[in-house]
Amino acid sequence: MAATNGDAELTVAEEAKEEEEATDDGGGGVSSQWLRAAVLGASDGLVSTAALMLGIGAARPADARAVLLSGLAGLVAGACSMAIGEYVSVHVQLDVELADLERRRRRGGPAPAGLGLHAAAAAVSRPGQAAAASALSFAAGAALPLLAAWFVAGAYRVRVVVVVATASLALAAFGAAGARLGRAPGGRAGLRVVVGGLLAMAATYGVMKLFRTHGV
């Protein structure tokens, strides 16, 4: 008899739990994966929102309101995009693994040992939870440069310095934290993340500055 969808989901979850217990000592458990995903989501939100604010500021340096509203719009849009993408991804991954499990059982073969922690642990019957986690991590990262600029009263150059400094410090912390979760040295990883974020912000700022210079 073919396995029902509920039985298949239960089996996938049980196998994921066994794999988690086997790999937890090596830093590859589900908890570590969730934390690393949260760090990546926060870094994504931080870089994209800071770059967006700097870009709008380069085009309209005298309009502080436009800069803040662009950051807020980036936070909301990015969080929604992350949530929807994670929700769809989780369902697709789960459907693929459940279909593979059922095909193996119909052929009378053994169930695969370790179907994938992402779909099994994070998505079985809880795609909404995975979507919410992605949205919240993105929003948390995006809120940092937005709040930094919000509470700064001064010239545009001052806001730029504050946003870049806040983003750099936070990126260094996120990069180091992600490396530590994988039991790797955090210093070099943090530096790489900071350099990447600064390049993204500089590119956005430069392009928008070019458009403003040419009167576009």
From Swiss-Prot:
Catalytic activity: Fe(2+)(in) = Fe(2+)(out)
Record key words, sorted: Ion transport, Iron, Iron transport, Membrane, Transmembrane, Transmembrane helix, Transport, Vacuole
Molecular-function annotations in GO: iron ion transmembrane transporter activity; manganese ion transmembrane transporter activity
Segments on the Vacuolar face: 58-65, 156-157, 212-216
Localization annotation: Vacuole membrane
Record membrane topology: Multi-pass membrane protein
GO biological process: intracellular manganese ion homeostasis
Transmembrane segments: 37-57, 66-86, 135-155, 158-178, 191-211
Annotated segments matching region Disordered: 1-29
Function recorded in the entry: Probable vacuolar iron transporter that may be involved in the regulation of iron distribution throughout the plant.
Record PANTHER family: FE(2+)/MN(2+) TRANSPORTER PCL1
UniProt similarity note: Belongs to the CCC1 family.
Protein name per Swiss-Prot or TrEMBL: Vacuolar iron transporter homolog 4
Organism from which the protein derives: Oryza sativa subsp. japonica (Rice)
